[in-house]
Amino acid sequence: MQKAAPRLLIAGTNSGCGKTTVTCAILQALVNAGVPVAAAKCGPDYIDPMFHREIIGAKSSNLDPFFFDDDTLRFLLAQNGAGKDVTVIEGVMGYYDGIGLDSSRASTFEVAQRTESPVVLVLNAKGAGLSVLAVLDGFLHFATENRIRGVILNGCTAMSYPTLARAIEERFGVRACGFLPQMPDCSLESRHLGLITAAEVDDLKEKMQRLAAKAQETIDLNALLQIAKSAPPLTFTPPDIPAAGEHVRIGVARDRAFCFYYEDSLELLRRLGAELVPFSPLSDERLPEDLHGLYLGGGYPELYAERLEANAAMRASIRAAVERGLPCVAECGGFMYLTQSIAGHAMAGVLSGSCFDAGKLTRFGYATLTAQRDSMLFAAGEQISAHEFHRWDAENPGEDFLAEKPSGRSWRCAYAGETLYAGYPHFHFYANLSAAVRFVEACRKEKPRHE
């Protein structure tokens, strides 16, 4: 299958160079200009897509080259961008940074190569002059086919930009697409797992509008659209997704404590026949009525542990449901909620042991999970790509999967049973379609108990 898909990948020289700010400014400026736009994010990050979603009013896809083969990457990109004039893809870390310090595997560069996407590189030009060209020269010559077609200078001044832009275009033949000056009043705060979430930024819309207004003055949006239109059509074989079966209702925990979900994973569950019913473990007294399954995603339960403990009725409702066999997927923060306690605050108590602050990132990064037993989602020996990203650990993290990092380091993790997956690893259902199908089928088996 071949699909036209104008697209543009906003990459950075390094983490902290301003690519999220620049991406958000461009997205908001395009929306304000009436351009139909889609958004995507390289890698497994949950938070940046939340900002994209707030701006464009639609989901943002994750394009992760560790999770997906070429066909799936291109399918998700084409599906998300259908009917749009352009898809703006935000990179992750530095352009060439991948797994480990000496590899570009799973990097933004790999996404650009595998999706044949033209790249605009964001360089931090604060306090720099000719050195900006030296940095750009390195990025252009590090890889023969780097796909870099344009440059945006972040932190640049209106006085410096014309000279630097002219030098960039004359020396390298790369389009200078504009700059964004320093705007400290529009900065996005960070915490231990990256940016704070979009829902926690009180004046997010105002900040995005200020960024967009400046971008409309200083960034050549038409040049970006021209670069996006130069992208070749996407060629791929779409995944074989079964037709939707009998309708089921799956409760999805969605509030400030539980907000880490891949929107394409949720959409896949819908395509398979699931109605997703949102609820809040923070605010609601009990689970919604007539659920056939439960999805507890990740997030920041440790920041809301006192409030989660105080909602004893919800904790009891979830414990009773899981213990009676309601099919349940609980990832990272959702897994923590099912344990006895978080930092001494009582949780649902379905699983033994408590969670504690490890004081550092624990088992951070990509891993391949291999099921050690048959369970609701996986047959013994089956694998799925996953990632862990947390500073908290558990006394009993489970042992029903073998997790192995690309470096070869391995450990046992997660709980798996006939109606349960619970563990620190996050995964994307498009990384193993069978897991999504089995989850929905398990929910259908639960349905007769409610009739």
Tell where the protein language model's regions lie, with residue ranges.
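ATP-dependent carboxylate-amine ligase catalytic core
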Residues: 2-21, 27-115, 119, 123-149, ...
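A short, charged/proline- and glycine-enriched loop
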Residues: 3-6, 243-249
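Hydrophobic/aromatic ligand-binding patch that stacks against planar heteroaromatic rings
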Residues: 29, 110-111, 168, 268, ...
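A short helix->loop->beta-strand "cap" motif at the edges of active sites that frequently abuts
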Residues: 117, 174, 323-327
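Internal gly/pro-rich beta-alpha loop/helix module
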Residues: 129-242
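Phosphate-binding active sites in nucleotide-utilizing proteins
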Residues: 246-323
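Cysteine-nucleophile active-site neighborhood
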Residues: 301-375
